[in-house]
Amino acid sequence: MLDLIQTRRALHQIPEIGLEEFKTQAYLLDVIEKLTTGKDFVQIRTWRTGILVYLQGSQPERTIGWRTDIDGLPIVEQTGLPFASQHQGRMHACGHDFHMTIALGCLERALEEQPKNNLLFLFQPAEENEAGGMLMYEDDAFGDWLPDQFYGLHVRPDLKVGQIATNTHTLFAGTCEVKIRFKGKGGHAAFPHEANDALVAASYFVTQVQSVVSRNVNPIEGAVVTFGVFQAGTTNNVITDTAFLHGTIRALTQDMSLLVQKRVKTVAEGVAAAFDMEVEVELKQGGYLPVENNPALARELMDFFDEKDGIELIDIEPAMTGEDFGYLLSKVDGVMFWLGIDSPYALHHPQMSPKEEVLAIGVAAVSSFLKKKAAE
């Protein structure tokens, strides 16, 4: 039987960023091959650093998919754990080591007997940076294994162990990366009339762009425009010719995201025109669409977990965090949910360390749900 804690700790020590998960893939394949030995109803494919494990059903009417992400983050771990990351500057700070371990545990249970319906276990690379789910879909990595229904989870530090949270609508916001570069004319600080100050224009833009949400977005729907990077100038007595801004747009519907993207671009171009300078606007959403749960399937999942002993189901509001599972759920009906891990540190924090007792709880809960879906 798979040792869940040992498996999680082994994976925790080898975090790798998106599309570079070579050790992670090798470890997963080794475990998967041991679990599936002698199971003639199982097929395995790889796609770059991803893995697809397909269980052929005995009388299949549909294919049920379970997705887990496998990449780490470019973070220096500060947990002090004896099994901390062995990869300098890399950490499983978003719980993907937990996701993988739970998926392996569920796979082990699913292999106890051939399911009626087909089951697909997807170990997806590059959730954090390149929208690996979108890349796999666009590259036809699924082929005829593409699920009819897709499910997945994400751990959540502010929920207690034993709590599962989701809803029947949007769970995660769609996210869009924004890069803006204003191009003016540099000069001496003493002669501003001979220059065209990109820093002033960019500063004006930062204040004006706040009106996009306050005056274009329905307050009930909500959206976020945040610029976390502002780079301009090199010294105190030189007027800079360029100013660079790097930020994010987040919205709970794709229509709202597109509206906000359009307005941000319009404001940037308007400010540039007002200051008689050039501007470059780069908007990159890619596969980070809103995670929109299928209402009927979400209600089914919520009712199932609500009746499980040891599980506290929470009907939760959407989060403004992003998840590339939204892309796959734009192609296939499905559901995502939160799994509580009770950590005082947030996701992406260098000291984030979930409680390991959630592993057994997660495997028991998810595998029982997948068993139900596989038998329908």
UniProtKB/Swiss-Prot annotation:
EC number: 3.5.1.47
Top EC class, one word: hydrolase
Swiss-Prot/TrEMBL catalytic activity: N-acetyl-(2S,6S)-2,6-diaminopimelate + H2O = (2S,6S)-2,6-diaminopimelate + acetate
Keywords assigned by UniProt, alphabetized: Amino-acid biosynthesis, Diaminopimelate biosynthesis, Hydrolase, Lysine biosynthesis
Protein name from the UniProt record: N-acetyldiaminopimelate deacetylase
Any one Gene Ontology molecular-function term assigned to this protein's record: N-acetyldiaminopimelate deacetylase activity
Function: Catalyzes the conversion of N-acetyl-diaminopimelate to diaminopimelate and acetate.
UniProt cross-references to Pfam families, sorted A to Z: M20_dimer (PF07687), Peptidase_M20 (PF01546)
Family: Belongs to the peptidase M20A family. N-acetyldiaminopimelate deacetylase subfamily.
GO BP terms: diaminopimelate biosynthetic process; lysine biosynthetic process via diaminopimelate
NCBIfam families, A to Z: amidohydrolases (TIGR01891)
Superkingdom classification of source: Bacteria
Active site: 69, 128 (proton acceptor)
Record keyword Endoplasmic reticulum present: no
Annotated source species: Streptococcus pneumoniae (strain Hungary19A-6)
